[in-house]
Amino acid sequence: MFNQSFLKYMLFGFFLFSFHAHADRIRDLITIQGIRYNQLIGYGLVVGLDGTGDRTNQISYTTHALKNMLFQLGITFPNEQNAKFKNIAAVMVTTKFPNFTHIGQQVDVIVSSVGDATSLQGGTLLMTPLRGTDNKIYAVAQGNIIINDKNSVERFKNILVNNHLNNGMIINGATIEREMHTDFGKNETLNLQLNNEDFTVAQEISKKINMQYPKSAVALNSKIIQVCIPNNNIEQVEMLATIQNINIPIPIQDAKILINAKTGNIITNQTININTCAITHKNISMTIAFNKLKINRLVPNPIIKSDKNNNKTLNDEQIYKNNYNTNNFQYLEKTSNLNTIICALNLFDITTTELISILQSMHDAGCFHAKLEIT
């Protein structure tokens, strides 16, 4: 039921944001164009598995990769057709290459099985070159793989732990062998990219930068602020450090509700006020008026009867006519925001699909003023 997985399927942030404007540092609002992560990838072998590796008689590329590796070590490989191993697995190795990383530094890598291995638990990744989009080798990975422990759920029964046995990590598993080329510091201008496009914020950032460095910044659009920078690399670093720590007053953000239809997660960026409305969805009826909420859910296949006083009964149980004591009826005072309404709906064990349908209907009817995005 929905209420049994309320925390799993719904997130209303950690706290609902207020409507008051606040100040953020520029560094929290932008990224610097050209400073980013670069992706590296490589193909390798994991050995030392306890009978959970690829079935080499069916996965030919695992045996072929092992043959090539042993050949480079000067070892003659036996007939591939008769070779059967259970302790090796073919894997793809990926990592993110940060900017300004130098030779000898180490980064974490992700190891994922590409064959039919059942688990990478206890395996060791053999030396694997990691290449960029230009096919050049930038790092070499090797080490013991760490995956989720099967006993994690038993030790932490109140925490949901997923055991992805065919996917693991090697902490500091790759060593940088080549530095990535970057154009940072070679141009006379630098673009600051807003994480969320906003003309007001872009103009405010440009204004604040110009107060510190006159006539150096201009907002090109709602996303890009172009800054003129000195040619000297040391002066560039000093200037950017100063700019990143400038405080910017953030205007009131547009109210937004984001719904993930697959997971059921619902996130809002502020308190959403609700207008007067009445909604009927399947066997659920809801009325909101004068900051009061009434919700009723009928049982399947109800038998409704009316007496001479027009009192309605459901399966011989009175539920209407000023009776708020039954389990199928909720009456709440002073409810004017979306959070309260969802909590009330949760009491009726509604499904995620029903909740999304109700919110969509309320939005279409103008019951609340916020951007609704369903992904």
UniProtKB/Swiss-Prot annotation:
Family indicated by similarity: Belongs to the FlgI family.
Compartments, as annotated in UniProt: Bacterial flagellum basal body
UniProt protein name: Flagellar P-ring protein
Record's keyword annotation contains Signal: yes
Record keywords: Bacterial flagellum, Signal
Matching InterPro entries: Flag_FlgI
Listed NCBIfam families: PRK05303.1 (NF003676)
The protein's assembly and partners: The basal body constitutes a major portion of the flagellar organelle and consists of four rings (L,P,S, and M) mounted on a central rod.
Keyword Lipid metabolism listed: no
Gene Ontology biological process: bacterial-type flagellum-dependent cell motility
Signal peptide: 1-23
Naturally occurring in which organism (per UniProt): Buchnera aphidicola subsp. Baizongia pistaciae (strain Bp)
Molecular function per GO: structural molecule activity
Pfam family, one: FlgI
GO CC terms of this entry: bacterial-type flagellum basal body, distal rod, P ring; outer membrane-bounded periplasmic space
Species lineage: Bacteria, Pseudomonadati, Pseudomonadota, Gammaproteobacteria, Enterobacterales
Function summary: Assembles around the rod to form the L-ring and probably protects the motor/basal body from shearing forces during rotation.
